[in-house]
Amino acid sequence: MAALVREVVGDVLRGARMSQGRTLREVSDSARVSLGYLSEIERGRKEPSSELLSAICTALQLPLSVVLIDAGERMARQERLARATPAGRATGATIDASTKVVIAPVVSLAVA
């Protein structure tokens, strides 16, 4: 199943906050949003309004366009992967008779 926009945006926001070494409290105070609500946004449970998303981006000193572009690129990668993966089969999760496995040749065997 494809990721929801709110989940991907939340991942981008959390990644930005963590890369800055900032806490939820710091960003929530700066953006004037409750810590719990910001946490839910980051976890993809809540979808922020455009105004709130802008406030969070301002608190992170990150242009809104950067967040949206990053989220769009992540979603595009997921969509390409989903199209490339045969229906009903998780990527790399199963091996069947049609799976080709390359085994490197053994140069020598040690005898104990």
Curated annotation (Swiss-Prot):
Keyword Oxidoreductase: no
Gene that encodes it: clgR
DNA-binding region: 24-43
Function as written in the Swiss-Prot or TrEMBL entry: Key stress-response regulator that plays an important role in multiple regulatory networks in response to different stress conditions. Involved in preservation of envelope integrity and tolerance to surface stress. Essential for macrophage infection and facilitates intracellular growth of M.tuberculosis. Controls the expression of several protease and chaperone systems, including clpP1, clpP2, clpC1, ptrB, Rv1043c, acr2, clpB, Rv3269 and the clgR-pspA-rv2743c-rv2742c region.
Knockout or disruption consequences: Inactivation of the gene increases M.tuberculosis susceptibility to the intramacrophage environment. Deletion mutant shows a significantly reduced ability to arrest the acidification of the phagosome.
GO molecular function: DNA binding; sequence-specific DNA binding
A GO BP entry: response to heat
Pfam assignment, any one: HTH_3
Residue intervals of the HTH cro/C1-type domain: 13-67
UniProt subunit comment: Interacts with PspA.
Alphabetical list of SUPFAM superfamilies matching this protein: lambda repressor-like DNA-binding domains (SSF47413)
InterPro entries hit by this protein: ClgR-like, Cro/C1-type_HTH, Lambda_DNA-bd_dom_sf
Protein name: Transcriptional regulator ClgR
NCBIfam families the record matches: trans_regClgR
Induction cue: Expression requires SigE. Induced by carbonyl cyanide m-chlorophenyl hydrazone (CCCP). Induced in response to thioridazine (THZ).
Tagged with keyword Transcription: yes
Keywords: DNA-binding, Stress response, Transcription, Transcription regulation
Species: Mycobacterium tuberculosis (strain ATCC 25618 / H37Rv)
